[in-house]
């Protein structure tokens, strides 16, 4: 049985902690110095004990971290350690901060993780062109798979999707690479955003596209927003995803997820036909969609400007020019709104609706199309006038 901090110890530490903090929740370095120096350890050792116990690196010790520091000091004095350990033993890690320790170990290369697989750029038949954008139909399917496999905390483990892996024509090495990509902290489970991205990568790989090498920064940040359980009585689960079998069936498979959902009894599942742009979705995916729409509008505006430049030799129509300027101003305003949305300012900070932004963009798109139609009609009128002038010249 691993050692543990006894209840009597905790009570002793609490009396010291509460006396030093005057009922506060944190102990500063100045408040802790007299207690720690009474141990007789060297200053450099005490500095390392502090760094080891300050798991969240906020420069203070809460009560759990103070217990860790005191226990390490007592173990040093009792000869359990020859020197300050470089890492905390697992039994001494506060469960409420275990995720921070695991993330730190992942960043320093000390955590278990799937073997990194070299990119196989010469794999026959694989295509470039992976796109992070999820169509409404694909996202609906991903969410269905997520709902069938999430645990009570809304997270999904690697092993929970084993039946799905078996239904795909994707090698296990690529499956593990995709998991590593969306799980930078090497956790045993991933949240909803990471799960949807993981399924999206597998879908593209199933369709013959290469696994991407990096994840957009905005998505990577959403992967790390995992929900933490603070119930210390919960039994600890396995911290690492189990390595899948190295031999995955690679024969001809059904379309991504269909065979798997059929086995789950969901073959009759149909979407309501509602576009996801009208539903409340996660901010990161909404940003991708809005940026795509902005790019399409930019392309259309460029075509309109090009058409206007071609007809500058004739009589200038002031009405289309006025409409064009107004649309450009509206487009600049929408771009500013998108920047505010990304930075959490303005309407976004006050709870502004992403749906209203998407609706406004749709309105701009309709107006641009109307402007193009108007330009075409004016060009037809211009051509007619030119023909009449030529006919008049010939008649003379």
Curated annotation (Swiss-Prot):
Residues 41-76 form the EF-hand domain. It is a peripheral membrane protein. One of its GO terms (cellular component) is endosome membrane. The keyword Membrane applies. Residues 284-395 form a coiled coil. Keywords: Actin-binding, Calcium, Cell membrane, Coiled coil, Cytoplasm, Cytoskeleton, Endocytosis, Endosome, Membrane, Metal-binding, Repeat. InterPro entries: EF-hand-dom_pair (IPR011992), EF_Hand_1_Ca_BS (IPR018247), EF_hand_dom (IPR002048), EH_dom (IPR000261), End3 (IPR025604). SUPFAM superfamilies: EF-hand (SSF47473). One of its GO terms (molecular function) is actin binding. Pfam families: EH (PF12763), End3 (PF12761). Residues 9-99, 138-226 form the EH domain. Ca(2+) binds at residues 54, 56, 58, 60, 65. Its main location: membrane. GO terms for biological process: actin filament organization; endocytosis; endosomal transport. It is found in: Cell membrane; Endosome membrane; Cytoplasm, Cytoskeleton, Actin patch. Component of the PAN1 actin cytoskeleton-regulatory complex. Component of the PAN1 actin cytoskeleton-regulatory complex required for the internalization of endosomes during actin-coupled endocytosis. The complex links the site of endocytosis to the cell membrane-associated actin cytoskeleton. Mediates uptake of external molecules and vacuolar degradation of plasma membrane proteins. Plays a role in the proper organization of the cell membrane-associated actin cytoskeleton and promotes its destabilization. Belongs to the END3 family. This is Actin cytoskeleton-regulatory complex protein end-3. The gene is end-3.
């Amino acid at each position: 049985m691993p050692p543990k901090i006894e209840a009597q110890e905790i009570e002793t530490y609490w009396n010291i902690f509460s006396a030093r903090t005057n009922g506060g929740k944190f102990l500063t370095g100045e408040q802790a110095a007299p207690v720690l120096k009474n141990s007789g350890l060297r200053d450099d050792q005490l500095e390392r004990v502090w760094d080891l116990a300050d798991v969240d690196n906020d420069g203070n010790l809460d009560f759990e971290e103070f217990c860790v520091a005191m226990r390490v000091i007592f173990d040093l004095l009792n000869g359990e350690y020859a020197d300050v350990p470089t890492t905390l033993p697992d039994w001494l890690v506060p469960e409420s901060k275990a995720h921070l320790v695991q993330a730190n170990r992942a960043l320093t290369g000390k955590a278990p993780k799937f073997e990194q697989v070299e990119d196989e750029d010469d794999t026959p038949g694989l295509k470039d062109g992976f796109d992070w954008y999820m169509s409404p139909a694909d996202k609906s399917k991903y969410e269905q798979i997520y709902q069938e496999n999430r645990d009570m905390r809304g997270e999904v483990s690697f092993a929970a999707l084993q039946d799905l892996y078996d239904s795909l024509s994707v090698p296990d090495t690529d499956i593990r690479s995709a998991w590593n990509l969306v799980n930078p902290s090497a956790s045993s489970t991933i949240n909803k955003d990471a799960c949807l991205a993981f399924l999206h990568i597998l879908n593209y790989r199933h369709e013959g596209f290469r696994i991407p090498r990096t994840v957009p920064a905005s998505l990577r940040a959403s992967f790390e927003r995992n929900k933490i359980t603070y119930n210390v009585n919960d039994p600890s689960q396995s911290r690492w995803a189990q390595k899948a079998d190295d031999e995955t069936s690679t024969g001809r498979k059904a379309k991504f997820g269909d065979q798997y959902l059929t086995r789950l009894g969901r073959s009759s599942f149909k979407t309501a036909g509602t576009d996801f742009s009208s539903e409340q979705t996660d901010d990161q995916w909404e940003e991708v969609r809005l940026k795509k729409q902005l790019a399409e509008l930019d392309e259309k505006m460029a075509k309109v400007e090009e058409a206007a430049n071609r007809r500058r030799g004739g009589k200038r129509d002031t009405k289309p020019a006025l409409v064009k300027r107004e649309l450009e101003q509206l487009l600049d305003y929408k771009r500013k709104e998108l920047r505010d949305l990304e930075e959490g300012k303005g309407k976004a900070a006050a709870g502004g609706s992403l749906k209203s932004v998407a609706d406004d963009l749709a309105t701009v798109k309709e107006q641009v199309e109307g402007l193009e139609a108007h330009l075409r009609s004016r060009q037809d009128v211009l051509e007619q006038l030119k023909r009449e002038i030529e006919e008049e010249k010939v008649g003379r």
